């Protein structure tokens, strides 16, 4: 599948029409369905064809609203699309009324001329990092069919990896864009949360929910982010020579899978040889996150506030594993919640201070390679243990109110591994600029070339 820039060029030079791009997209989707794929909860072929034909007609008259005009994209089934039911990957909302308007991010994509091919499958209510879904099926990792694609934006990543779309719109509360991007060897960007409006999106945690893209390149993510945020950032590549990059052994480096550790350390070595300064630093505050956020945290309390009425009416319709995590929030007192918010405020301050001397903080996106489906599908203990480990690293960035970009850093023949380039709130432009240069370096090495 082409990148956004390549698709734009093909459309601009009339080598392809929007309808031809869509036909290729739908053919790839049909092939996935024939194999039993569970990438989507809904595919609206008629609306997609109407949008593609309209884009071609507008282009013929000289009207091209953006680089996304006429380009197929997918939308996570957490966003309202006018006239459609938003299920959030759950049976609970199947009979809800259709949305009367687009979610804010979807409306911006529509105004930009994007062609929506379907609503992508996900972990129920976005409350898992693994991507399992007992209601709509579990999207499989495209490169490794017996392994998980990651979650919660599982279908979003698969839709890009299989070439259905050039980019996908997802959400990230504790890694839900970056985990599936890393597991599917893609690029994923979690922006500073407040940059993209959340109106019309089913919430998980109002403190941490972020809207971000999954795509094949940093450039694709920049283009998507510029549209959904309404902000055109200056993301010109920054030279690697002279960059000051931080790496810590605290918490996020604990118990790494050997493949992850090897790929991460190899990437660090490449950056050093390219002229970047990599400094090892202590980050003891991360251990407070380990004690507070993943176990009970703000997310569970805020999720329970939204779900409690649904649980009271229809608890049996929930995935039992999601319900168990939701009920953690049921027992939180007001005092507990205030303490959690205060802990978060301290961590935001402390992390900003710790990272102030660096251009970016680097860590493995996920501590493990994509788990085998059979490992967690029918074993609750394995599910919760693996889910916690998968969420561990990326959730730190949400807790510190930061932004992060994940890039593939494995080599051909290795299981997928992601390298995260992280920064504090509103460092988005800098992180994307650095990401452009790191991406070139890593791609040079992907086939075993020496940097």
Model-derived features with residue positions:
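An N-terminal boundary/leader segment
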Residues: 1-45, 49-50, 273-275, 446-451
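Serine-dependent amide/ester hydrolase catalytic core
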Residues: 6-12, 57, 308-399, 450
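Structural helix-boundary/capping segments
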Residues: 12, 31, 111, 161-254, ...
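Acyltransferase
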Residues: 17-23, 53, 103, 259-282, ...
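Residue-level signal for inorganic ion chemistry
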Residues: 25, 48, 221, 245, ...
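Short glycine/serine-rich loop/turn segments
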Residues: 31, 68-210, 250, 363-383
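Immediate post-signal peptide segment of exported/extracytoplasmic ligand-binding proteins
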Residues: 55-72, 220, 238-246
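Short helix-loop capping/hinge segments that flank enzyme active sites or metal/cofactor-binding pockets
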Residues: 68-91, 242-244, 297-349, 364, ...
């Amino acid at each position: 599948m082409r990148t956004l820039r390549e698709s734009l060029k093909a459309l601009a030079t009339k080598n392809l029409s929007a309808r031809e791009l869509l036909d290729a997209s739908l053919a790839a989707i049909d092939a996935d369905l024939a194999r039993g794929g569970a990438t989507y909860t809904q595919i609206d072929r008629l609306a997609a064809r109407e949008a593609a034909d309209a884009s071609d007609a507008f282009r013929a008259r000289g009207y091209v609203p953006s680089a996304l005009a006429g380009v197929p994209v997918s939308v996570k089934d957490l966003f309202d699309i006018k006239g459609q039911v938003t299920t959030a990957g759950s049976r609970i909302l199947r009979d809800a009324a259709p949305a009367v308007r687009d979610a804010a991010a979807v409306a911006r994509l529509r105004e930009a001329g994007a062609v929506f091919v379907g609503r992508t499958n996900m972990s129920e209510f976005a409350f898992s990092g693994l991507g399992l879904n007992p209601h709509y099926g579990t999207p499989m990792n495209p490169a490794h069919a017996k392994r998980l694609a990651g979650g919660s934006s599982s279908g979003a990543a698969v839709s890009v990896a299989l070439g259905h779309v050039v980019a996908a719109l997802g959400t990230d509360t504790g890694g839900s864009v970056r985990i599936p991007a890393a597991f599917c060897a893609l690029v994923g960007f979690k922006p500073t949360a407040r940059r993209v409006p959340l109106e019309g999106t089913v919430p998980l945690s109002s403190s941490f929910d972020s809207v971000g893209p999954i795509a094949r390149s940093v450039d694709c993510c920049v283009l998507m982010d510029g549209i959904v945020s309404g902000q055109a950032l200056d993301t010109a590549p920054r030279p690697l020579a002279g960059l000051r990059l931080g790496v810590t052994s605290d918490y996020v480096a604990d118990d790494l899978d050997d493949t992850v550790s090897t790929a991460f350390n190899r990437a660090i070595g490449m950056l050093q040889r390219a002229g970047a300064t990599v400094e090892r630093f202590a980050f003891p505050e991360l251990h407070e996150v380990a004690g507070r956020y993943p176990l009970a945290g703000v997310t569970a309390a805020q999720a329970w506030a939204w779900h409690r009425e649904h649980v009271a009416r229809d608890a049996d319709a929930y995935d039992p594993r999601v319900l168990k995590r939701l009920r953690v929030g049921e027992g939180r007192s007001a005092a507990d919640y205030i303490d959690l918010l205060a802990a978060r405020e301290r961590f935001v301050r402390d992390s900003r201070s710790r990272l102030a001397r660096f251009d970016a903080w680097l860590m493995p996106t996920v501590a493990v390679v994509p788990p085998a489906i059979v490992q967690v599908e029918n074993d609750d203990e394995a599910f919760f243990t693996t889910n916690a480990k998968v969420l561990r690293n990326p959730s730190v960035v949400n807790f510190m109110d930061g932004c992060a970009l994940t890039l593939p850093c494995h080599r051909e023949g290795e299981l997928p591994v992601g390298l995260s380039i992280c920064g504090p709130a509103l460092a988005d432009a800098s992180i994307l600029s650095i990401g452009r240069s790191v991406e070139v370096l890593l791609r040079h090495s992907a086939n075993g070339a020496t940097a």
